[in-house]
Amino acid sequence: MKLAYWMYAGPAHIGTLRVASSFKNVHAIMHAPLGDDYFNVMRSMLERERDFTPVTTSIVDRHVLARGSQEKVVENITRKDNEEAPDLITLTPTCTSSILQEDLQIFVNRASISESNNGHSGIDKATSDVILADVNHYRVNELQAADRTLEQIVRFYLEKEKKLNTNTIPTKTKKPSANIIGIFTLGFHNQHDCRELKRLLNNLGIEVNEIIPEGGSVTNLKNLPHAWFNLVPYREIGLMRAVYLEKEFNMPYVAISPLGIIDTAVCIREIEKILNNLSLNGYQSSLPEGHKLTNEELNGLSQKNNEPSLPEEHRQLDGALDSKSQKTYNFENKYIKQQTRFISQAAWFSRSIDCLNLTAKKAVVFGDATHAAGITKILAREMGIKVVCSGTYCKHDADWFREQVVGFCDQILVTDDHTQVGDMIAKLEPSAIFGTQMERHIGR
């Protein structure tokens, strides 16, 4: 915990609340003192949605400090269960209330079967699912907590479904389909990215199975294993869940962000590789009960089964299938090259006055790991702009970031201290700054 003038990534409970408020019919209860309850105001101001932010603060005051928190927290959980009837109630402390060192899991267990709020004897069992966000508020930031909370919610409902249907193997959709993981509230242009991702998948003949968590329902999380693969556009949130689904259900995932022409092509080729490995054919229907495909089996599946041709209804993209064998997807000639040469506006923009003014000029990039790495490569490879410094505030993902941007910039900066970023910008005097709101202030 530290006192800061500016924070690139907020405290852990903000990430938990962002995930909870992204789902439909999910309510979050924040066990916190006054002063930590600014999330409602922040989200209402930035998102401009019609519905109220589904977050209730269980305030830690002098009465709580004197008597303990259990009675008040349990009362708030059961009250919201009766008033809102949500599918899920998520309880989270803040870094401040964590100082009390209370076992909130006991409160969750008590709320599931608790005494009536009115003091009458008897049992008043909450109809909603109640979970405690399992996050260390002293060791992780907002993005790490969001990723962990999303994985925890998905794990909770998939294990719940597994207990109800112990002998049932999830069946895949008839047509190739994907889950888009990581679109959530207060994300940087997440809605625009989601629209473009859906358009991209549709052009490739791939259906969208579920979009999690933004606008999704926790009751639909049981449908996640029905998709053929998972698409994770941002490393900051969704990667843990994709790894969990791969481990438990052998679902492959694509974690390449389609930013820029080159990386978009790389992402599409990775999707093509996955679809070909899965043989496009209801590959799991002939497996014995409870059997999971290994990577070796996936890679050798097409040779073993001679890859029967795909039904006509699957051929949404003209030329997606190899014309000779009619067995595998081939997006290279009919989609990637066509988009790159004739559809993309990159060639036009590279000759525009805006881009020419920046050619051979110096630029500084700073942001989260996904966007900073993507923008750095776009500027260096596709626009001919010299990136003198590229940086990120995601210190937990520093190794991946350095691996991505090495060779595309002169210096690499990994820090969450805005003063270091300001000093670097003042020293380099770039012609353009690509960064967060703080870098905008620094540039002025």
From Swiss-Prot:
It is an enzyme of class 1 (oxidoreductase). It catalyses: chlorophyllide a + oxidized 2[4Fe-4S]-[ferredoxin] + 2 ADP + 2 phosphate = protochlorophyllide a + reduced 2[4Fe-4S]-[ferredoxin] + 2 ATP + 2 H2O. Pathway: Porphyrin-containing compound metabolism; chlorophyll biosynthesis (light-independent). GO terms for molecular function: 4 iron, 4 sulfur cluster binding; ATP binding; metal ion binding; oxidoreductase activity, acting on iron-sulfur proteins as donors. It comes from the Eukaryota. Its cofactor is [4Fe-4S] cluster. Protochlorophyllide reductase is composed of three subunits; ChlL, ChlN and ChlB. Forms a heterotetramer of two ChlB and two ChlN subunits. This is Light-independent protochlorophyllide reductase subunit B.
